[in-house]
Amino acid sequence: MELKNIRFLLFLVSWALLAQCRIDAGSIPRRLKAAKLDLVVGRGATNIRTIKEAIATAVQNRTGDKRYVIKVKAGVYNENVIIDDNLPNLTLLGDGKGKTIISGYLSVLGNNLTTFQTATVTVDADGFIARGITFRNTAGAKAEQAVALRVSGDRAAFYSCSFEGYQDTLYVHHGRQFYKKCDIYGSLDFIFGNAMAVFQNCNIYVRQPKSKDAVITASKREDPKNQTGIIIQRSHIAAAPGTHLEGIKVYLGRPWGHYARTVIMQSHIDSLIDPEGWLWWAGKEDVFKDKIYYAEFKNTGPGSSTARRVDWGNARQVITPQQAEQFTVDKFIDGNSWLPSTNVPFSSGL
């Protein structure tokens, strides 16, 4: 073979490898990585050492509703942060899960607060984005309700973040929310609320609960007209690393609201899930009967069998592809209309 042909073949191979690398790297939002920074928080960067100080500065300095980007350098930030509705289109960029950590300890039992007030980070603003940040509540299982993050704004997107707590870790309170490649840790009702929330390619890790039951989701949907629910797609449900759940019954969800709606689809479910799958909210069996909607679609893994799932009302739903399509990013949260501008990668359909 002539030298020029060999060089040409080597060029093609190199180009193919580079293209593959670009495809693999495509899951990382490049524009987020290269976003223009308005503020930097952390040691050695500026005089701003706390996130609360950065938020206050942003409120004072920004003009209009143009996106405002705050870089939060690696470190543990022991503070409770509130992002009010007067700061829409805010982005917090961390240095990665387990590196940039926002940590709090407030709880219902330990601080005489409502669940709503315990959040380490509260997002009331629309258009919020976070990437590469751990949101943590260290109160522990015995402290009962202790929220790591509460989101009440619309069009919130989280990429490669971690949410760590026990009971009531992630409060998806209101609005359209999207979580991509995130880790959620908890023991009881640790994804809960009345938002339109989709979790895609996430790890959902169950921790040791205070009692003998562990429950992942608790939808607060109260009206059949509400287009709300908790959707888990292409994700992995497992015991938290190092956690032993012998003697513990683990359930996919229980109904906090009269018309609770949760859908688990195209996900891998480990053997920790009880064969019945779903649990009643104690004392509300007759109230919620035939109103709740729990569905599963094309899940895999030893905990995915629906043969012994509970059989009450709409709780036992093995849905068709046409039905599952209604719970995709495109259909359920109208993601095609707003997620592209966040630069967070997503799959719009099944």
Would you name each region that the model predicts?
Residues 2-350:
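Sequence-level preference for short, compositionally simple segments enriched
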